[in-house]
Swiss-Prot record:
Pfam families: Cytochrom_C1 (PF02167). PANTHER family: CYTOCHROME C1, CYTOCHROME C1, HEME PROTEIN, MITOCHONDRIAL. The lineage of its organism: Bacteria, Pseudomonadati, Pseudomonadota, Betaproteobacteria, Nitrosomonadales. Part of the ammonia monooxygenase complex, which catalyzes the oxidation of ammonia to hydroxylamine, the first reaction in the process of ammonia oxidation to nitrite. Residues 1-20 form the signal peptide. Its cofactor is heme c. It comes from Nitrosomonas europaea (strain ATCC 19718 / CIP 103999 / KCTC 2705 / NBRC 14298). This is Ammonia monooxygenase gamma subunit. InterPro entries: Cyt_c-like_dom, Cyt_c-like_dom_sf, Cyt_c1.
Length: 234
């Protein structure tokens, strides 16, 4: 129930906390594959390294990563760097007062951000930051105008500027990754955030199929039983 309320609140507030830059931007299709556990593990590591400092994921516990093939030792080595236990919630390292002082607003919890925004929106958002000297952070975003969040991945992607007149992004300084490598990194990160929003989704689908098959089977048995009961009457 708590997750449902949070998701509804995020959806309702989205139009008030973000708006586009005045031009229509086509969202890129995110290559999501929830069955790819290696991608989910890479995404989990990237999330902890680059997102969990400011953003929390308070509906998720570290030990839930057993679902994506991570052992207890893997979780401790790759995901826990602050002395937390594997059964603890994934809380942001930065305190709320500090975050508000830095960004003017407390960074949102990312537990259900993929369900609120959509995978394609996140995939496009994380790849369309550009330098903008008119903003407080020095960064802006093609689909989230005047975003408070700085581009924390700029050293990976490189520096981009918005080309006047065309609305295209042009790279002015390369990062440590090629475009293909960065796109793959973001795809893994978004894939993980989709998993984060509903870790039990694969089990729910399997259970749903099993229940439907059971009901269809029961329907057939019920029909045969009905025919047997009414055989003498008909």
């Amino acid at each position: 129930m708590r997750m449902i309320k949070f998701l509804l609140l995020a959806i309702l507030l989205a139009p008030f906390v973000a708006h586009s830059s005045g031009q229509e931007v086509k969202l890129d299709k995110a290559p999501i594959d929830r069955a790819d556990k290696e991608s989910l593990q890479r995404g989990a590591k990237g999330f902890v390294e680059y997102c969990l400092t400011c953003h929390g994921a308070n509906f998720m516990r570290f030990n839930r990563h057993h679902d994506i093939g991570m052992s207890e030792d893997d979780i401790r080595a790759d995901l826990i760097h602050t002395g937390q236990k594997t059964g603890d919630l994934m809380e942001a390292a930065m305190r709320k007062k500090e975050a508000e002082g830095w960004f003017g607003v407390v960074p949102p919890d990312l537990s259900v951000i993929a369900r609120a925004r959509g995978a394609d929106w996140l995939y496009t958002y994380l790849r369309t930051f550009y330098q903008d000297t008119s903003t407080y952070s020095g960064w802006n975003n093609l689909i989230f105008d005047k975003v408070a969040m700085p581009h924390v991945l700029h050293h990976l992607q490189g520096w981009q500027v918005l080309e006047p007149g065309t609305g295209n992004l042009v790279q002015t300084k390369p990062g440590t990754m090629t475009k293909e490598e960065y796109d793959r990194f973001v795809a893994d990160l978004v894939n993980y955030m989709v998993y984060l929003g509903e870790p039990h989704a694969p089990y729910r689908r399997e259970l749903g199929i099993t229940v439907l098959l059971f009901l269809f089977g029961m329907l057939g048995l019920t029909y045969l039983l009905k025919k047997e009961y009414w055989r003498d009457i008909h």
